[in-house]
A protein has these predicted regions:
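Short acidic-glycine-tyrosine-enriched beta hairpin
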Residues: 70-88
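Short, conserved beta-strand element in jelly-roll/cupin
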Residues: 50-65
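Short loop/turn motifs at secondary-structure junctions and domain boundaries
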Residues: 19, 46-48
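Ligand-binding loop in jelly-roll beta-barrel domains
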Residues: 86-106
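Small beta-barrel nucleic-acid-binding modules, principally OB-folds
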Residues: 32-41, 101
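Surface-exposed, low-hydrophobicity beta-strand/loop segments enriched in small/polar/acidic residues
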Residues: 41-43, 86
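A short, N-terminal "cap"/entry segment at the start of jelly-roll beta-barrel domains
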Residues: 1-34
Length: 106
C-alpha cells in the first residue's frame, strides 16, 4: 500500500459529515474517472447503506463489520485490509479505534 493514492485528482472541498461528525470523508475523482472517498471514523457503531458496490480499504485502525444478511457473524479488519459491499445493501461497522479509510465506488 502506497502513501500516494493519486497524483492528479478532482477533489470536492465540502466534507461529507455523518453521525454528528464522528465519521467524515471527502470525495474525489481519480484520473480514470473513478469516484473515491478518503475519510476518518471515530470509535463507535454505525450503519451505512450502499447504492453502488463499494471497496472499503482500511488504511489504519481497527473495525468489525456485519454484512447485511449475515446474522451475527462480525468480521474484523485492520490497516492494510479491505472488504467489499454489494450495491443496494447495508452494513454495520464497529470502530474500535480511530480509523482512516478509502472507499472506492465500483
Amino acid at each position: 500500500m502506497s502513501d500516494i493514492i493519486e497524483k492528479s485528482v478532482d477533489l470536492l472541498k465540502k466534507a461529507n459529515i455523518y453521525f454528528e461528525g464522528r465519521v467524515t470523508s471527502r470525495n474525489y475523482t481519480d484520473s480514470t474517472g473513478v469516484v473515491k472517498s478518503l475519510g476518518v471514523m471515530l470509535p463507535g457503531e454505525y450503519t451505512f447503506g450502499t447504492k453502488a458496490p463499494e471497496h472499503m480499504e482500511i488504511i489504519s485502525g481497527k473495525v468489525e463489520v456485519l454484512f447485511e444478511g449475515m446474522e451475527s457473524n462480525w468480521e474484523s479488519f485492520v490497516g492494510g485490509q479491505y472488504f467489499e459491499v454489494p450495491a443496494n445493501s447495508s452494513f454495520e461497522i464497529k470502530v474500535d479505534e480511530i480509523t482512516d479509510y478509502c472507499c472506492t465506488y465500483l
